[in-house]
């Protein structure tokens, strides 16, 4: 039994950890952060290919083991390949990893006040198999032949011995947990586009959805997990607002005009030359590089060998010689 799981050995944080090292556990809470994105949306269900889901449409859902909001990565950010209990307080598994048992926190509740139970976890797992992407369902059925509720706050997953089991604890530990009662009451389908939002157990709730214009979420004052070590120093904004714009140029202009308050710049050319506008000159905009210590994602250049220049073997050889390895 353990309070977390690591792909690579010992956990960085002990069972009695109080917060992650990179957070301020006493960080002030309040205010609003607004972000700009380009594009449009017509749904708040990101688990289907039908329609286009809005920003923050997963922000209210939690999992047994901790993930960053909206599925942006595992927690903690300073310990790669590690997971710590969120809705589950303990994870239990043998050395062979043939199975895993999650022991859940009885105090966990959905935003409508109903308890989060192992029945909801099993329902969510089965819903993904029955109504999720077919490719996902086919792969998971082969790897997880059975899942069973032991009691209201304990669930067991059994893994196939025909596949590597190292990542399977992460797989089942990070599936979103949905309310079984809500789905049964409303008849909602996971594979259908919809704007109706099921209750989640997370620190934020969807406050307002203006299709193709904005999505606003607010901190839930009744959130059950504020005092958990995994949440200390996090979820500090009272409101997060995402504004939609027709394209990236319009989104940048909105930032320059002060309509949105935060922007992540990924274009080197913009970073070097586009930040010369009145608000910047007045000191109302802080331009700062943030060090990212996480392992970089894989990137590459893909050549279209059907193009006329690359049909020439000598050109391909010249391109290969340009690389210093």
Description of each model-found segment:
Residues 2-96, 126, 199:
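N-terminal lobe/hinge region of extracytoplasmic solute-binding protein
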Residues 2-4, 30-39, 89, 99-102, ...:
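Short, well-ordered beta-strand elements
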Residues 26, 42-48, 55, 72-75, ...:
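Short, solvent-exposed loop/turn elements at domain surfaces
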Residues 146-148, 207-218, 243-307, 318:
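Extracellular/periplasmic solute-recognition and catalytic clefts
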Residues 103, 137-184, 203-210, 306-311:
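Surface-exposed binding/hinge segments that line
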Residues 13, 23, 27-28, 48-56, ...:
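Aromatic- and charge-enriched surface segment that lines or borders ligand/interaction sites
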Residues 34, 117-124, 152-158, 202-203, ...:
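Alpha-helical secondary-structure segments
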Residues 60-85, 171-241, 246-250:
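Gly/Pro-rich hinge or "lid" segments in bacterial periplasmic/extracellular proteins
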């Amino acid at each position: 039994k353990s309070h977390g799981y690591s792909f690579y050995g010992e956990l960085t944080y002990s069972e009695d950890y109080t917060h992650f090292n990179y957070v301020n556990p006493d960080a002030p809470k309040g205010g609003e952060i607004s972000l700009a994105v380009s594009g449009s949306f017509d749904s708040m269900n990101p688990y289907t290919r039908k329609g286009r889901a809005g920003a923050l449409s997963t922000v209210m859902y939690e999992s047994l083991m901790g993930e960053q909001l909206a599925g942006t990565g595992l927690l903690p950010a300073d310990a790669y390949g590690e997971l710590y209990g969120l809705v589950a307080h303990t994870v239990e598994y043998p050395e062979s990893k043939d199975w895993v048992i999650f022991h859940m926190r009885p105090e966990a509740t959905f935003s409508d006040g109903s308890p989060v139970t192992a029945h909801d976890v099993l329902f969510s797992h089965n819903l993904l198999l029955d109504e999720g992407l077919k490719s996902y369902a086919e792969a998971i059925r082969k790897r997880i032949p059975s899942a069973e509720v032991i009691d209201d706050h304990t669930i067991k997953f059994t893994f196939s011995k025909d596949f590597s089991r190292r990542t399977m604890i992460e797989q089942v530990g990070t599936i979103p947990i949905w309310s079984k009662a809500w789905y049964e009451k409303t008849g909602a389908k996971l594979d259908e586009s919809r704007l109706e939002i099921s209750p989640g157990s997370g620190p934020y709730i969807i406050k307002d959805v203006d299709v193709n214009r904005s999505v606003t979420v607010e901190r839930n004052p009744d959130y059950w997990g504020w005092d958990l070590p995994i949440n200390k120093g996090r979820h500090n904004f009272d409101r997060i607002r995402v504004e939609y714009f027709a394209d990236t140029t319009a989104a940048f202009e909105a930032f320059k005009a002060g309509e949105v308050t935060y922007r992540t710049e990924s274009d080197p050319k913009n970073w070097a030359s586009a930040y010369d506008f009145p608000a910047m000159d007045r000191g109302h905009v802080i331009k700062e590089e943030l060090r990212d210590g996480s392992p970089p994602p894989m990137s590459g250049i893909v050549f279209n060998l059907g193009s006329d220049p690359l049909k020439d073997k000598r050109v391909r050889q010249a391109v290969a010689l340009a690389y210093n390895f």
